[in-house]
Amino acid sequence: MKILITGASGFVASQIIPHLRASGAELVLISRDVAALRAHYPECASGDYDAWDSLAEGVDAVLHLAAKNNDADGGAETFHNVNVGLLRDVLRKTKKSGIAQLIFASSLHARPETASKSHYATSKMAAEKLLEDQCSLALRIYQLAAVYGTELAGNLAIVTKLPTPVRPALLKILGALRPTLQARRLADEILNAVNDPRSERKILTDQQRDNPAFTLCKRGMDLVFAATVGLLFWWLIAIVWLAVKLTSEGPGIFAQQRVGQHGKPFICYKFRTMKKDTKQAGTHELTNTSVTKIGKLLRKTKVDELPQIINLLKGDMSLIGPRPCLPTQIELIEARRSLGVLDVRPGISGLSQIRNIDMSTPKALAQSDAEYIALRSLPLELKIILATATGSGQGDKTRDT
């Protein structure tokens, strides 16, 4: 395996090159600072961009790391010249050299919700568009979170100012507040990509794995929410239960098996909004005549979800996460399984819900759920909670008759 890396004298390269070399990859390093390359990596072939043709022979993939980063000074033109103009030249050289694969290190800043906020973000979004329009190679676009390894840079560098014993804990806390990416995980992803050359766009983060700061805060929010609702709104729960019982035949609370974390089934509790003996199917598969009169109001106001505080207390669900589906929704289950969505607990509300993506489009829903997992942070959890509370997302819709 032979990988040509641009921007090889930069921070991200310095954190992943040891992992790539330890895995047996042969590296060709390119940078404007050739002296730094030869000083740090004397065992690797290296040169500047003018030496590309002589260095590119036998290369399997190009990893384009060269960029003007978001902590650098400069105007829009300066960022565009480096992050788009240089990429265009690298793409041309890659094609000319007959290299079959290009791996582009983009950024979470290039996502649509942030791309208008800085010259860096705008240039990274333009770079992705350039590749989508002009790259005919096997193309991997990786939107990276803040990368960390044996060293820290950017906003994470604040950790290095504290005593060594407390640094790991602070790094976990910062990771709970914004997505981060361990260098080893990035290196492993690159190695897998070179072994499997195909086109893909992917968000790369640690996904809050092994982050006790995020896990404890998220679980704490679940328990506080469940306890608050139970203590303050027990009377509303009792009134709604009685109203459902009196206005239609059937139980007040509907207990239904759903697919939970790791694909394990659990019983999900909701106020019944459907008529008795309605078939077990996704809401989008049912007609609106299946919904009771009071059920329409409960679904619109989301009050039907209140009994799910039981699931929060039991740990079956979280306040925020992918909405749990039925065991019969095989297409959605398999799509979620393939994207790792089943690795986390399902939620009462989620990113897909406030985006109005429901179970009628299983592949799109699974992809959106996977994006949520990659982007998870405490601020995002709070953003989804606020959006849900203010009326965003109305859940799965029934079919018109």
Map each language-model feature to its residues.
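N-terminal Rossmann NAD(P)H-binding glycine-rich loop of SDR-like oxidoreductase domains
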Residues: 3-23
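NAD(P)H-binding glycine-rich loop region in Rossmannoid oxidoreductase-like domains
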Residues: 43-85, 89, 93, 109-113
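Conserved Rossmann-fold NAD(P)-dependent oxidoreductase catalytic core, especially the SDR/UDP-sugar
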Residues: 88-122, 140
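Conserved beta-loop-beta element that borders a ligand/cofactor-binding pocket
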Residues: 132-152, 199
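NAD(P)-dependent short-chain dehydrogenase/reductase
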Residues: 145-178
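A hydrophobic, helix-centered structural microdomain
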Residues: 210-276, 384-401
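A short, structured surface patch at a secondary-structure boundary
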Residues: 285-344
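C-terminal terminal-structure detector
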Residues: 341-401
